[in-house]
A protein has these predicted regions:
Chain B
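A conserved regulatory-domain signal marking ACT and ACT-like small-molecule sensing domains
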Residues: 1-131
Length: 431, 131
């Protein structure tokens, strides 16, 4: 099923013409409304007229998460707040969240691209969809919600967590589709199996995203639940879920090219790479009103496929994310930077920042453990005081990253010191 | 009296490591106890030379600390411990932890209290003998 055949199956020449036109309009809008970009363009000696089409895209400056942080919270918005109808946020690199905004048109475009994703996965108004992404500042819940409403599916807005309720809804309300993180769906599958409820559910398809996952996980999910597992990709800075999506052929995610222009760059030289190469994925938002971004560096590694897909869509496809160019971790769908944990430890002040982060997947749920060296300065010879310290560190980290963490105190000098850039993370999830 | 307290992770061989270091530094252990939690323990020792034990263990990167404790000698007969605790409790002292041993006619008790100075004074007034 194709939601918007006119756009999704447009030939390359036409889509590039549309992109060029929208890019030029965007550059003008941004130049006059976002001082941050105007300054950047002036430094580069770039004038509005220098961008005549997508062939000039490489002349524009890059944008990073740090830029958004430096302009926290609303500094990069291109419209007055009276036109912003919603704000979302995701974790930043050091504790300050990355804030994004949407106008009414932005929300409408967002619903449109999620509707395309749902149709791509075969979900229509005949379906009931259990939306188990968190509703709130996180874009997952409300993003999926808007698209599901647009296609007219019956939404069961469960939001994240509360496994008991999730299972009850799967059994009693008989949804045919579910949207959540792949690891959470595996966890739900385990629970259904344990309670011998697998034959009581009507699920047919799952729309999964917000964290990296492998082909092996896909196979596991499809086998355990006897459903199709479809990938949806997105990031709040660009829009949220729906920036790209897999169709039922599961061979790369179709990018909504009428809204976002993708590029693949070399993360070291920052030069665009030839078609088909693997590198860092970069997006320029050409229709966004509230928060238009030039060449946003996702730090995700991928490559682009330009051939027409078997499904008939001509839109460019991105291959499954193979890694990141920074040290960001995605744990239970939440972005976590080691620097956030470091800043939590520094705020406590009693610990020297020698720590190690261990990420693991136990029973299909991501676990986060932080080992902290016990400094002599605060070593107490009473267990109760050490336990109080553990609780204090745990609370501080949870306050900053928003997900649960286990803190373990270890002896001084037992965490490996490395020369140069310290290795702070051991990820045992094999993803 | 100075007790030495050492932070030790719960893993095989760690206690062994401490005793090896102390032996190499020519230090004799007089009394010991281990307080344990799930992941780590605190080893508390009375040793022949607390200051030098502290230096030796610090050099080997252990988190160590000297703690004031009171070590009392009593007769190994029933009611001895009760008499000490009565003196402390009547004096408003709370015991944070304690350990002890008995051999032959003598028993030794080691206390960590919230107020070691007052506790020593009270015990002295009541004619208890220190180790």
């Amino acid at each position: 099923m194709i939601w918007n055949e006119h756009i999704e199956c447009m030939d390359r020449e036409q889509i590039e013409k549309l992109q060029s036109q929208r890019l030029c309009e965007m550059v003008e809008r941004v130049y006059y409304n976002v001082p941050f970009y105007r300054k950047k363009m002036q430094v580069l000696g770039l004038e509005i007229g220098d961008i005549k089409g997508i062939e000039d895209l490489h002349k524009l400056p890059f944008t990073t998460k740090d830029d958004l942080r430096e302009n926290y919270p609303f500094g990069m918005f291109a419209v007055p707040m009276s036109q912003v109808v919603r704000v979302h946020a995701s974790s930043g690199t050091t504790g300050l969240p990355t804030v994004v905004g949407y106008t009414r048109n932005d929300l409408s475009n967002w619903s449109e691209i999620v509707a395309r994703a749902l149709y791509g996965a075969g979900v229509s108004k005949e379906d009931r969809i259990q939306n188990s992404y968190g509703y709130g500042l996180f874009t997952g819940g409300l993003g999926l919600h808007g698209g599901a409403e647009k296609v007219g599916a019956t939404i069961l807005p469960l939001s994240g967590g509360n496994t008991r309720k999730q299972i009850q809804s799967l059994v009693d309300f008989e949804p045919t589709a579910i949207s959540c993180t792949p690891s959470y769906l595996l966890y739900l599958a385990e629970t259904l199996k344990e309670e011998e409820l697998l034959d009581k559910i009507k699920l047919r398809v799952a729309i999964l995203g917000a964290e990296p996952w492998t082909e092996n996980m896909r196979k596991e999910i499809e086998k355990q639940l006897n459903i199709k597992a479809i990938d949806i990709y997105g990031l709040s800075e660009i829009m949220g879920p729906g920036v790209s999506f897999e169709c039922i052929n599961q061979c790369g995610s179709h990018i909504a090219e009428d809204h976002f222009i993708p590029e693949i760059i070399d993360p070291k030289t920052l030069k665009p790479l030839p078609r088909g190469s693997e590198g860092e994925l970069v997006f320029t938002t050409i229709t966004k009103e509230a928060l238009p971004l030039f060449r946003y560096r996702t730090k995700d590694l991928s490559s682009l496929i330009y051939e027409t897909c078997e499904c008939g869509r001509t839109s460019v496809r991105m291959t499954k994310i193979t890694g990141r160019t920074d040290d960001m971790l995605i744990i239970r769908g939440v972005n976590v930077f080691p620097s956030q944990i470091e800043s939590a430890l520094l705020e406590i002040g009693e610990t020297q920042p020698h720590y190690m982060i261990y990420v693991d997947r136990v029973n299909n749920l991501d676990t986060l453990e932080v080992w902290v060296e016990v400094d002599e300065k605060f070593f107490s010879d009473e267990i109760k005081q050490l336990e109080a310290l553990t609780r204090k560190i745990t609370k501080q980290i949870v306050n900053i990253i928003g997900i649960s963490v286990k803190v373990k105190l270890v002896e001084p000098k037992t965490i490996l010191r490395s020369e140069g850039k310290a290795k702070r993370v051991v990820d045992r999830r094999h993803i | 009296m100075k007790q030495i307290s050492i932070f030790v992770e719960n893993k095989p061989g760690r206690l062994n490591e401490v005793t090896k270091i102390l032996e190499n530094c020519d230090i004799n252990i007089l009394a010991l106890t281990v307080a344990d939690s799930n992941e780590y323990g605190i080893l508390r020792l009375l040793v022949s030379n607390a200051e030098s034990a502290l230096d030796c263990l610090k050099n080997e990167n252990f988190s160590v600390k000297l703690v004031d404790v009171i070590a009392v000698n009593v007769s190994n007969i029933k009611g001895s411990l009760h008499r000490i605790l009565s003196v402390l409790s009547d004096g408003g002292i709370s015991v944070e932890y304690m350990y002890g041993y008995a051999e032959g006619e003598i028993a030794a008790l080691i206390f960590k209290t919230n107020d070691p100075i007052l506790a020593s004074k009270l015990l002295e007034e009541n004619n208890f003998k220190f180790l």
